[in-house]
A protein has these predicted regions:
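Transmembrane helix-bundle signature of multi-pass membrane transporters/permeases
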Residues: 44, 80-85, 89, 163, ...
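Membrane-embedded alpha-helical segments of transport systems
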Residues: 82-94, 153-161, 205, 309-320, ...
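Membrane-interfacial loop-to-helix junctions in multi-pass transporters
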Residues: 49-51, 152-156, 203, 238-239, ...
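Transmembrane helix boundary and interhelical junction motifs in multipass membrane proteins
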Residues: 53-57, 209, 279-287, 318-324, ...
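Signature of multi-pass transmembrane helix bundles
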Residues: 7-11, 18-26, 30, 34, ...
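Juxtamembrane helix-boundary/capping and inter-helix hinge elements in multi-pass membrane proteins
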Residues: 64-71, 107, 182, 221, ...
C-alpha cells in the first residue's frame, strides 16, 4: 500500500510540476528567482541518490554474485546463467538500436533548446572523457577498487564486486572457510538491508524532488521536452513488446521446437501480476506456482532459477537505459561512437546483476550510465528529473518483461535438460 501511495504521490508531483512549469514557460516571465528557490529541492534528491548509488550497487552485486550456482548445480546452473546473460545482452543491444533509431532529443528545434544546457560544460571536454578507446575502457575496469570507489569508476566497481562475490562463493565450499564466509555474507546482507532502508527514506522524499526538477525543467525548456518524452515511451514499450512477442518466442521456437505462444498464454498470470504490482518479488510466488502446475517444470530447477532471475535478470531495464543515454548525448553534445555504445551495453548488462531487488533499481543503474558519460551534476539532475517523471509507467512494462524473461529461461533450460514432466 505504501508503495502504491508513493507512486501516486510521485505521479501527482510530476503532473503538478509539469503544469506549473509549462505555465511559467508560456507566461514568458523571468524565472531566475523561482529556479533559485525551487531548484535546490530537486538537487537534494539527486545528491542523495548519488550518495547512495555506490554502496547499493557494491553490496547488491557482491550478494548477487555470491548467490549464483556453482558446481553443485552443474551444467543446468551454467545454462541458466548463460541464458540470463545472453537475453540481457540482447535486450541492451536492442535498446541501443532503438535508441539510435528514435534518437530522442534530436532535431534542429530541440538542439537549439539544449544549447544553454550544452554550455554548462565544455562539449569537447565531455566527449573526450566519454569516448575513450576500447583499450582504455578495458584497462579502467581493473582499477584499484578503493580508488574506483573514490573516483566513482563504476565499471571497475562492478567488475570487482562481481569477482569478490564469486570468490566468496567458491571459497565457501571449503570446510575451513564455510562458516566465516556465511558470517561475512550475513553481514553484507544486513548492511544491504540497512542501505535499502536509506533508499526508502530517499524515495519518500522523491515527490518533492520530482516536483522541483520537473517544474524547473519545463519552466526552462517548455514544449521541447514533450518530444523526447513521447519518443522515450514509445521506444521503450516497442522494445519490450519486441522482446516478449518476438525475441522470446523465436528463442523457444528455435531451441525447443514448441509453439511459444502456448507457453506465453500459460504464464499470463505472473506477467499480469508483475505489470500491476511493478514488483518481481511480488510476482515470484505466482511464477513458482505456474512453473510447477501449468508448465510442469521440476522444482529442482524452478526453485533456484526463478529467484535467481528476479535478482540478476533485468531485460526490461536493459532496453530503457540506452534511451536515456542517447537523450543525454543529444542534450549535452556527447558524440556517440561504437566504443561508447559498446561501453553502454557492457555497463548495462553488468550493472543489472544484483540490482533486481534494489528499490528504485533502474534509477540506480541510470546513475551509473550517466556517471560513465562524465556528465556534470547539473546535467545528471536534468536527466534524472525526466526519468523520475515517467518511471512509474515504464516500470510496469519493464517488470513484466523481467518476469517473462525469468520464466522463459527457466522453462527453456528445463525443457532442454529433460526436467519438464509433460510434453507441450
Amino acid at each position: 500500500m505504501k508503495k502504491k501511495n508513493l507512486v501516486l504521490q510521485v505521479f501527482i508531483a510530476f503532473i503538478a510540476g509539469l503544469v506549473l512549469g509549462v505555465v511559467l514557460w508560456l507566461a514568458k516571465v523571468d524565472i531566475s528567482g523561482y529556479v533559485k528557490i525551487v531548484s535546490p529541492f530537486g538537487q537534494v534528491l539527486v545528491a542523495m541518490l548519488k550518495m547512495i548509488v555506490i554502496p547499493v550497487i557494491f553490496l547488491s552485486l557482491i550478494d548477487g554474485a555470491a548467490s549464483v550456482p556453482t558446481k553443485e548445480f552443474g551444467k543446468i546452473g551454467i545454462k541458466v546463467i548463460v541464458w540470463y546473460f545472453l537475453t540481457s545482452l540482447f535486450a541492451a543491444v536492442l535498446g541501443s538500436v532503438l535508441a539510435i533509431g528514435f534518437n530522442p532529443g534530436s532535431g534542429e528545434a530541440q538542439q537549439a533548446a539544449w544549447k544553454s544546457l550544452i554550455n554548462t560544460q565544455n562539449t569537447s571536454e565531455i566527449a573526450s572523457k566519454a569516448n575513450n578507446s576500447l583499450a582504455d575502457v578495458f584497462i579502467s575496469m581493473f582499477q584499484n577498487p578503493f580508488k574506483a570507489l573514490a573516483d566513482g569508476n563504476f565499471l571497475a566497481i562492478i567488475v570487482f564486486s562481481i569477482a569478490f562475490g564469486l570468490a566468496l562463493k567458491m571459497i565457501s565450499e571449503r570446510a575451513e572457510y564455510s562458516g566465516k564466509v556465511k558470517t561475512l555474507l550475513e553481514i553484507i546482507d544486513v548492511a544491504k538491508e540497512a542501505i535499502f532502508k536509506i533508499v526508502d527514506w530517499i524515495l519518500a522524499y522523491s515527490p518533492i524532488g520530482v516536483f522541483a526538477l520537473t517544474s524547473v525543467n519545463f519552466a526552462s525548456y517548455g514544449s521541447s521536452l514533450f518530444g523526447p518524452y513521447i519518443k522515450l515511451t514509445i521506444g521503450v514499450v516497442l522494445g519490450i513488446v519486441a522482446m516478449v512477442l518476438i525475441v522470446y518466442p523465436l528463442m523457444m521456437a528455435v531451441t525447443l521446437k514448441v509453439n511459444p505462444f502456448k507457453v506465453l498464454m500459460k504464464i499470463k498470470e505472473p506477467m499480469l501480476t508483475a505489470f500491476v504490482t511493478r514488483s518481481s518479488a511480488a510476482a515470484l510466488p505466482v511464477s513458482l506456482r505456474v512453473a510447477k502446475e501449468d508448465l510442469k517444470i521440476s522444482e529442482n530447477i524452478s526453485s533456484f532459477a526463478l529467484p535467481l532471475g528476479s535478482t540478476i535478470n533485468m531485460d526490461g531495464v536493459c532496453i530503457h537505459l540506452p534511451m536515456f543515454a542517447i537523450l543525454a548525448a543529444n542534450m549535452f553534445g556527447v558524440k556517440v561512437t561504437f566504443v561508447s555504445l559498446s561501453v553502454l551495453v557492457l555497463t548495462t548488462v553488468l550493472a543489472s546483476v544484483g540490482a533486481g531487488g534494489v528499490p528504485g533499481g533502474s534509477l540506480m543503474l541510470l546513475f551509473i550510465i550517466l556517471q560513465n558519460m562524465k556528465l556534470s551534476p547539473d546535467q545528471i539532475a536534468i536527466i534524472v528529473g525526466l526519468a523520475l517523471g515517467i518511471n512509474p509507467i515504464l516500470d510496469m512494462f519493464e517488470t513484466m518483461n523481467n518476469v517473462t524473461g525469468d520464466i522463459v529461461c527457466t522453462y527453456s533450460v528445463a525443457k532442454l535438460s529433460g526436467l519438464v514432466d509433460e510434453e507441450e
